[in-house]
Swiss-Prot record:
NCBIfam families: GTPase_YsxC. This is Probable GTP-binding protein EngB. The gene is engB. The lineage of its organism: Bacteria, Bacillati, Bacillota, Bacilli, Lactobacillales. Its cofactor is Mg(2+). PANTHER family: ENGB-TYPE G DOMAIN-CONTAINING PROTEIN, MSS1/TRME-RELATED GTP-BINDING PROTEIN. The keyword Magnesium applies. Necessary for normal cell division and for the maintenance of normal septation. It comes from Streptococcus gordonii (strain Challis / ATCC 35105 / BCRC 15272 / CH1 / DL1 / V288). Mg(2+) binds at residues 39, 61. SUPFAM superfamilies: P-loop containing nucleoside triphosphate hydrolases. Pfam families: MMR_HSR1.
């Protein structure tokens, strides 16, 4: 499948099933804790500066944001998790919204699960990964902010992340940087492989 990534736009924001686009265009969901670099990942992948708004206020994305890419693929930006200043009620609401999408959406082909390469995965990161494995949803694990760590230490950080998550070798692991575009091609290859299956 040839995709013109320049032909991308935000399509709609949805709070529940009734708002999802009604068609069979494949979707890739993007999940990760607040401030992991999800918006930067989307903007880098689509070669745009601010298609996905990078928010200085974590926890701002409270809906599922659907991005249309060339009418052939969609990215679905899932609300960032693990942000402490959001009330328990809000967190529970997000949880239900995310769970409903991930477990019932037939268009979903895989989840890009983003973690910060600099830090050991949080309890929320582990829970998200276990959730995806439990529901047998294909995972592309993307470790962001690779430019913040010397190249010589990448392997050490990668191993620590894989160990903490009990990483399944059948899943894809990609080191990524929105600053120097490390992992850009590998991410597209992994996504298109899932979409074309």
């Amino acid at each position: 499948m040839e995709i013109n990534t320049h032909n991308a736009e935000i399509l709609l924001s949805a709070a529940n099933k009734s708002h999802y686009p009604q068609d069979d265009i494949p979707e890739i969901a993007l999940a990760g804790r607040s401030n992991v670099g999800k918006s930067s990942f989307i903007n880098t992948m689509l070669n745009r500066k601010n298609l996905a708004r990078t928010s200085g206020k974590p926890g701002k994305t409270q809906l599922l944001n659907f991005f249309n890419i060339d009418d052939k693929l969609r990215f679905v930006d899932v609300p960032g998790y693990g942000y402490a200043k959001v009330s328990k009620t809000e967190r529970a609401k997000w949880g239900r919204m995310i769970e409903e999408y991930l477990t019932s959406r037939e268009n979903l082909r895989a989840v890009v699960s983003l973690v910060d390469l600099r830090h050991e995965p949080s309890a929320d990161d582990v829970q998200m990964y276990e959730f995806l494995k439990y529901y047998e949803i294909p995972v592309i694990l993307v470790a962001t902010k690779a430019d913040k760590i010397p190249r010589g230490k990448w392997n050490k950080h990668e191993s620590a992340i894989k160990k903490k998550l009990n990483f399944d070798q059948a899943d894809t692991f990609i080191l990524f940087s929105s600053v120097d575009k490390t992992g850009l091609d590998a991410s597209w290859d992994a996504i298109l492989e899932k979409v074309n299956k």
